[in-house]
Amino acid sequence: MAGLLKKIFESGKKDVKYLERKADEIIALADETAALSDDALREKTVEFKERVQKGETLDDLLVEAFAVAREGAKRALGLYPFKVQLMGGIVLHEGNIAEMKTGEGKTLTATLPVYLNALSGEGVHVVTVNEYLAHRDAEEMGVLYNFLGLSVGLNLNALSSTEKREAYACDITYSTNNELGFDYLRDNMVVYKEEMVQRPLSFAVIDEVDSILVDEARTPLIISGEAEKSTILYVRANTFVRTLTEEKDYTVDIKTKSVQLTEEGMTKGENYFDVENLFDLENTVILHHIAQALKANYTMSLDVDYVAQDDEVLIVDQFTGRIMKGRRFSEGLHQALEAKEGVTIQNESKTMATITFQNYFRMYKKLAGMTGTAKTEEEEFRDIYNMRVIEIPTNKVIIRDDRPDLIFTTINAKFDAVVEDIAERNAKGQPVLVGTVAIETSELISSKLKRKGIKHDVLNAKQHEREADIIKHAGERGAVTIATNMAGRGTDIKLGEGTIEAGGLAVIGTERHESRRIDNQLRGRSGRQGDPGVTQFYLSMEDELMRRFGSDNMKSMMERFGMAEDAIQSKMVSRAVESAQRRVEGNNFDSRKQVLQYDDVLRQQREVIYKQRYEVINAENSLREIIEQMIQRTVNYIVSSNASSREPEEDWNLQGIIDYVDANLLPEGTVTLEDIQNRSSEDIQNLILDKIKVAYDEKETLLPPEEFNEFEKVVLLRVVDTKWVDHIDAMDHLRDGIHLRAYGQIDPLREYQSEGFEMFEAMVSSIDEDVARYIMKAEIRQNLEREQVAKGEAINPAEGKPEAKRQPVRKDQHIGRNDPCPCGSGKKYKNCHGKEA
């Protein structure tokens, strides 16, 4: 252990030596840079950009670029970065975390690597915890970047897509972590590439990196939509399929558990829902509901595939016979079963896109961060983000007095002592910052101070701007500020006149937070830049942390020594508290790691789908090659399921193949039973694919190439998006329910990974099938518009159309089902005299 500590300590010393050497090289260029005129300094930016274009790396430019940015800061901001700030900037450029104490000028430090990396032209994101700080820093530091000839954008929640696109197109973009994540998700839901706002993710510098990558790591970003308002449609589809007769209206393939409507069944469906053509792209929602109702009624059996109990449908595991709690069939099949069994159809709000901050920020080519407190989470940053935490020495020696904890037996005794301490310090004009863990504690102390007539401000992290304003004045003589969970991070507390003589800022902690890092943040508000200051934590045996980690022995020890109301100040107790905090931090790290492991399953799937969408949206030419692969996979699956080369030919179900092809791929009769008899499985596949190729060629002639390309895009995007949203929702249910399966020695994560993979595979096959069906069967219309997948469209009965004068019907001519009826009614043949034919 001692050897390990020595190693870590020595590597830290090595880092500092290397950084000092590099910073000295930058400082050596100070006179040369200072001699340049403003225009010549600005010209340097153009020169650097050209050198990057010609192949020089950013590392090659670091010393010169930092020297230019440093001189620029002096001229534009009146601030001249210290040596330690140059060191911090180098750490950030290298994609690590610079731990810099409060008041050491992190915001200015970040300008150096941000300037350098913006020279690549790929865009740099500066990330803050709230919009107030993003706005403030973009405005203040933007003066420097503009002076040096770089553009600065501010990405706020209220901006329109066009404004966001402009902000992201700038060399440097300030934003909150939430907005970046949501923009990424929204970009992967758009249907035209022009609607995307972000550029590929290159370099991000995160301010308060521990807050974003650690504290918020367990919170996923979710875009949810209203669930389908199609309860009625499930019920109608269910009622409709129950009127159908097997063989006449539909066929069932037992092997693949699939059901196909026959021509007659389709006509009945079109009449029942009062639509002209079920395969029209406008009617995909109806067709989907009919397909699921058919599956629910004719391939799924109660008490075999699922059970209905307590007003819900629960899935039965086919292998173990156990109920799979929390799991729901995807793509609306579960709702179709609910309609079949007459239980409540569940349509809660639907997760349409989701990502965790961990996985979002890991997509950047390079990630860096800065904070005053990261050392305690060093292992997490290394394991999850591959970032090292490097401590940057302070510019001036810290002379703050950090006192050992004061421990009381009861919570009341503790609060009385806190208020006494505040009153004493306030009387001599010393500013006091009181840190609490909960809002109730803030309010309790506030009411006690009111009773004593002590003027004070309370911060509860609600209004960021007012918060920053209060924090600015928190260092003035006689100021008392109560802050919950260190609200007001990001704004310095500067000491006012006469406060240094009063002892500087006194920080009082009313209990220890479960994370040492948060305690250190509170401490770090005092003693900035060599100022005097004092910090004191007050604890009681009734505090939550003490209760959770067995302080009964300590409590009885204190009572035995007659310390019931007095405080003890003991290093032993402080050490016990710290070890309790370490245990909590360990638990929290494990839980964040677990969130990441679960999200990694979805991450891999998300990357596949988003990549496919991106290719479709950006495709300039026909997507036929991609679509033909999907058709081929579908045909392979149908043929091998019904005519496997591994089974004797007498067991083949050739009629099943014909039924599927007729219903989903080609006009009825294009492939007949005679065509595929006495052929091998491979020959059957090739025969069907050849016929499909001919039909595809014919389809392509119906529209000009650009319009046909657009038709292909519409089909692909609509199918992929519908299936993906359903899949995410199903994965959500699986994630929620996986822990309820407490049988055997199952590992929930392994179970989630394997089931999630199966569900993804099923979704991909389902995408193939639907794309094949719509491309081959949908009626092609001009001026098709891509639209974001809209759920649960209402089914409107057809508007009354004026009667057209009917013409006599000539029986001898061959009329296609979708041709206009020769009687002149204006309807399609199948919906008019075709019914009688």
Curated annotation (Swiss-Prot):
Positions of the UniProt region annotated as Disordered: 791-837
One GO term under biological process is:
protein transport by the Sec complex
> Which GO CC terms are listed, alphabetically?
cell envelope Sec protein transport complex; cytosol; plasma membrane
Sequence ranges of Basic residues compositional bias: 827-837
Which positions in this protein are listed as binding Zn(2+)? Answer: 821, 823, 832-833
Composition bias, Basic and acidic residues = 800-817
Cofactor list: Zn(2+)
Family as reported in the entry's similarity comment: Belongs to the SecA family.
- Would you tell me the protein name for this molecule? Protein translocase subunit SecA 1
Source organism of this protein record:
Listeria welshimeri serovar 6b (strain ATCC 35897 / DSM 20650 / CCUG 15529 / CIP 8149 / NCTC 11857 / SLCC 5334 / V8)
* Taxonomic classification: Bacteria, Bacillati, Bacillota, Bacilli, Bacillales
Gene for this chain: secA1
